[in-house]
UniProtKB/Swiss-Prot annotation:
Main location: membrane
Keywords for this protein: Cell inner membrane, Cell membrane, Membrane, Protein transport, Translocation, Transmembrane, Transmembrane helix, Transport
SUPFAM superfamilies listed in its UniProt record: Multidrug efflux transporter AcrB transmembrane domain
Quaternary structure and interacting proteins, as annotated: Forms a complex with SecF. Part of the essential Sec protein translocation apparatus which comprises SecA, SecYEG and auxiliary proteins SecDF. Other proteins may also be involved.
Protein name: Protein translocase subunit SecD
Cited function: Part of the Sec protein translocase complex. Interacts with the SecYEG preprotein conducting channel. SecDF uses the proton motive force (PMF) to complete protein translocation after the ATP-dependent function of SecA.
Transmembrane segments: 5-25, 353-373, 375-395, 398-418, 450-470, 477-497
Top-level division of the source organism's lineage: Bacteria
UniProt entry tagged with the keyword Transmembrane: yes
GO BP term, pick one: protein transport by the Sec complex
Gene name as annotated: secD
Location within or outside the cell: Cell inner membrane
Pfam families xrefs: SecD_1st (PF21760), SecD_SecF_C (PF02355), SecDF_P1_head (PF22599)
Amino acid sequence: MDGKLIAKLLLIAAVIGFCIHLATPLNEKIALGLDLQGGMHLALDVDTEQAVERKLDAMTNALRLEAQQQHLVIGTIQRRGMQILIPVPYAEEKAEFKRLMQRRYGQLELQDEQPELLVYGYTTYDIEEIKELAVGQALETIRNRIDQFGVSEPTVQKQGDRRIIIELPGVEDVDRAVELIGRTAMLEFRLVNENVSTRDALDGFLPENSEVLYQRHMDPQTNTEVDRTPFVLYRDVIFTGDRLLDARVRFDPQFNTPYVSITLDGEGARLFADVTGRNVGRRLAIVLDGHVHSAPVINERIPSGQASISGQFTMEQATDLSIVLRSGSLPAPVDIVENRTVGPTLGQDSIDKGILSVTIGMALVLLFMVAYYRLSGLLANMALLMNLIILMGLLAYFGATLTLPGIAGIILTIGIAVDANVLIFERIREELRRGASPRLAIEEGYAKAFSTILDANITTLIVAVILFQFGTGPIKGFAVTLSIGILASMFTAILCTRAIYELILVYKPIRKLSI
């Protein structure tokens, strides 16, 4: 036995042994996909237009505050569409404001200038950058929420420019998961405008700097709205949930109800202390997603940076609220464009049918190869079993998730592996018909079939890579198993079966090849 053959046999034994080690025990090493173990699939679209509008709203509020601090005599700054309109009736104020914009707000460009009006906005490049950043922030925020929700092996990935795909295996409370993921959680602190009665505001007598928001009163049994209270709030946001450091569920022993205690960061605590110190006796509203949760009276300056959000919460609702506040608000609302739920019973049924399909397909192929190619068919069957071992080992090594399309990829891999052996065996038969000896026929058969097998597998591999790059979860699962299967089939068909032939020829010279 020469050194090359020994090296081949050692390599084959090492690869097979390593793959058996990787894939054992199989049920622990290979994770099942959503369609096999049950769970939820969501497709979300991020409203990137609103992300830009929110950015402009924040900039508008900042400019109003800046104008007040600089004592500039100008009109009411407001956003209209994707532009900020700044009325400037006096030439001096206009020049001063333009200098201020260049010095402090260089990210905004002057898009139009009239005698008594300045129009600013973001460039097209900046708008696209804001949109891209919004999707990235939404992706990270949703990941954080899911991590705190406690789902094992979730999939959260971006698709296209604004879509986010989420797969949550094993989730049972679907409604709660959807609420937790899709909630914007925009937390704002605003002062109540007590100079205007709610009746006047509802009748249309509302100052430009104010708006009406409602506090909802929910039925704790049915979780439906039974009443709501209007509040007139200043549009200016004192600060948002960006200043939030922590949010925890606490229990109020006096009323026997849970509430959410929030802790602000250093800058947030400073702002909170300043606002509460300057507005003792006034009401400060805590607004979440456009609804007033509470509007307590400020009794004294609060330097601790601690506040609480109370309401008619159940323990589960308070827990979910603390999760979304800790993970941060979404930079823009998200729309659920697809919501699919697979029950565990259906998933188990898919597993059973998938195993049955692989078993039947494998058995038919094994029988055909032995019946048609006799002893050589038996060698091909050994290579096919090695192929499956390598496939499972590499799936476990790469942490791939096995899906129903992935099982289809395994079945297709069986066909590809057999196809390579069929090409080799037919070439060997051609050489035998020409009168070549078994040894020479085997050498020539493998040599002449190699380029055909390589070309066919490379083209299939290219397609699999494209499917993986541009496909979603199930398609990616198919592409992964197909890619690994192609590589495994080339290894087993070209190297393993030939090494076995060579080993047989070393110990028993063959006059007639069983093929």
